[in-house]
Amino acid sequence: MDEEILDYNEQKEGWVSKMVDWQKKHISDRQMTLILAFIIGLLASVAGYFLHGIVHEIQLLLTSGFNKGTYNLLFLLFPIVGIYLTMLFIKYVVRDNISHGITRVLYAISTKNSKLKAHNCWSSVVASGITIGFGGSVGAEAPIVLTGSAIGSNLGQIFRMDKKTMILLVGCGASAAIAGIFKAPIAGLVFTLEVLMVDLSMASLLPILISCVTATCFTYILMGSKSLFDFTLTSPWALDRVPACLLLGIFCGLVSLYFMRTMSACESFFAKLSPYPYVKLLFGGLILSSLIFLFPSLYGEGYSAVNVLLKGQNVEDWGQVMSRSLFYGHNQLLILYIALVTFTKVFATSATNGSGGCGGTFAPSLIIGGFAGFLFARLWNVNQVGVYVPEQNFTLMGMAGLITGVMHAPLTGIFLIAELTGGYQLFMPLMIVCISSLLTISIFESHSIYALRLAREGKLLTHHIDKAALTLLGMQDVIEKDYHPVGPDLPMSKLVSEISRSNNNFLPVLDQAGVLLGVIDITKIRHIIFRTELYQHFTVRQLMMQPSAVLTEHDSMDEVMQKFDKTDAAQLPVIDVAGVLKGYISRTRIYSMYRQIVADMSAE
C-alpha cells in the first residue's frame, strides 16, 4: 500500500513538473500570472460558497425550530459543542495552527517569501464553518482570506514564480476572497492595498482586478445577486448632518480602540491557558454561551441582526433584533440591549477564538460598527441633540467607521459599505465618518489590529520602501560562512598563514566547542604583520579583541542595521544562544542585497 502511494506521488510530481516545464517554454511568466489570477478568483469564490453553505446548513439544522418570542437554553450548549468539534478537527486532521488568518497572511508576505501551507487552501473553510455554524461569534472573512491567499501561494509555488510575483498572487487570493464573499470587487482591491499593504503598480493592478472581478462574477452565479445587507436609501444626505457625522467618526474611533485593546488583552489571557486546552475550552465556552443566551444577536456572524436595524422604520421593527432573548417584547429596553451587544461582542469574539474556535474579526468589526452607529443615532434622536439623523444611514456609516478604525483602512470601509448596499449616495458622509475615525484611532494606535502583532516584532512589510526592503531581507539571506576560524593559542606565525588564505578582514577566534572568544581584525594588526621578529612574542589570544557588537540568529534586519550604525563595524559575528558562531554579516553585503530588492520593488 505504501509503495502504491509513493508511486502515485512520484507520478503526480512528474506530471506537474512536465506541465511547469511546458509553461516556461510556451507561456511567459507575465501571461501565466494573468491566467493564475483568473484561476485564483474562481477557486476563491468556490471556497466562499462552500463556507457559506456549511454555516447556513448547520445554523438551519440547529436553530430553525426556535421560537423568536422566547429564550432557548440550547444557546448554552451549541457554541461549546462547535468549539469542541473545531478543536478536534484542528488537532487530529489539520495538526497545525490556523488562527489569525489575515495576520498569518501578513506574516507570510513579510517573512516567508509569501509561502503558505497547502492545507490552508481548505482547512480554515471547514474549521470556521463548524465554529460559526454552531454559534461562534466570529467572522468568515479572515478564514476565506487565508484560503484565497493560500491558493495563490501554492499555485505560485507550483509554477516556480519569483518572490515579487508570489506576493502578487497572495494579494490576488486575498482580494478575490473579499470581493467574492461580499460581492464587492473594488473593496477587494483596496483591501489588498490597505490591509495587506501590497504595493500596486500598473503591472500588478491588472491581475488583482482579474481575480476580484472573476470571484465576484462566479459568486453571483453560485449564490445569486442578493446583497448581504438589505438597505434602501430613504433619507438622502443633507449638509446639516455634518457635525453628527464627525462625532460618529470620533465615536467609532474610540470604539475601535476599545475593540483592539480588549481583544489584545483577552488574547494574552487565553494564551496563558494554552497548556490547559480543556480548561480554556470550558472557560471560554461558558463565557461565549452565556453571552449568546443573553444576547442571541451575538450568535454566529450576526449579519441578520444588522439587517433588522437596516430594514426597520420604528421601535417595533427594531425591537425584533431582541428576538429569542429575555429582552424580547420590552422595546423600551432597545437602547440598553443595543449598547450591551456593542460592548460585549468583543468578549464573545475573543472567547470564541481563545477557547479553540476558528474565525476572524472582520465580521465582528462590521457588527459592532453597525450597532454602534445605530446606538449613536438613536441616542441623538431621542435626546434631540440636533437635526434628525436617520438610524439606518448611521448604522451603515458606523460599519464603515469601525472597519476604518480597526483595520486602518478608510478606502475599504467606504467602498465595502457602498458596494454592499448600493448606497453610493452616502459617499460624502461615509468619507467624513471614515476620516474622523482614522484620525481618532491614529492618536492611540499606529497599526491595524492585524499588523499590530507583527509590527511589534519587526516583521511587518509596509508601504515605506526602505523599511519594506529591510523586512524582505532575512538573516539567512545575508549571513556569510566563508570564514577561517583560529584557536586562541595559535602562534602569530601560523596566524599570518591563515590571514593569507582569508578573503576578508574578519577572523573569528573559537574554542574547541565553537564558542566565539573574540575576533582578529586584520586592519588593527597590520603594523606588526610584516615584522617577523615579533612573531614569536605573540599568540592569537594576545592579538584578538572583543567584537564591538554581536548579532543573534533571531535579530530582525532593523536591529542588525541599528547595531551596524552604532558600531561603524564592517563585519559583525552571528552567534546562537550558546555563543556558538554561526557566521558573520558584512555591511557591504547588506547594502548590496538591499539595493537589489529596492530595484526589484521599484521595477514595473
What is the meaning of each model-derived region?
Residues 482-486, 542, 547-550:
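Structural signal for short hydrophobic segments within the conserved structured cores
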Residues 211, 433, 480, 522, ...:
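ATP/adenylate-binding site constellation spanning eukaryotic-like Ser/Thr protein kinases
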Residues 517-525, 584-591:
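Short hydrophobic beta-strand motif reused across regulatory alpha/beta modules
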Residues 1-472, 476-482, 486-507, 511-517, ...:
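Alpha-helical transmembrane segments and immediately membrane-proximal extracytoplasmic
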